[in-house]
Amino acid sequence: MATAFKNYTAQSIGTTAYYVISQNSGAFNGGVSGLTSGKAVIMVGCMVSNRLTTSIAIDVVHYQNAGSKTTYLCKSLAIPAGDAIEIVQGKIVLMTADDISVVSNTASSADVVLSILFDA
């Protein structure tokens, strides 16, 4: 399979974790799939925006190997009203069954765009 850039998006994320790559709310659901053997995904960007007129706090979590390890990319990070923040300012390598979740402290408050290089 050829290398390709992909964007995963989600709108109005709230107080239930949203798994961006599996496009699933509430429970981990497989994460990255369909990779060519020996290949990976490189996350090159992750932008989270606040849809509301009040501040929100977000968590962005990397789930490695189908959720066996969890690492916070940010925890309780405040995003001012109507603002956005770039979570990834470098690159993060994702493997098969890895995923990224976003959750907010406020219902229907956050949008996310996750940009990846697939089959790198």
Region locations from a protein language model:
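C-terminal interaction-tip segments
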Residues: 1-39, 45, 104-120
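Beta-strand elements of well-folded, non-transmembrane domains
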Residues: 50, 64, 116-118
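Short connector loops at helix/strand junctions that flank enzyme active sites
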Residues: 40-43, 55, 95-97, 109
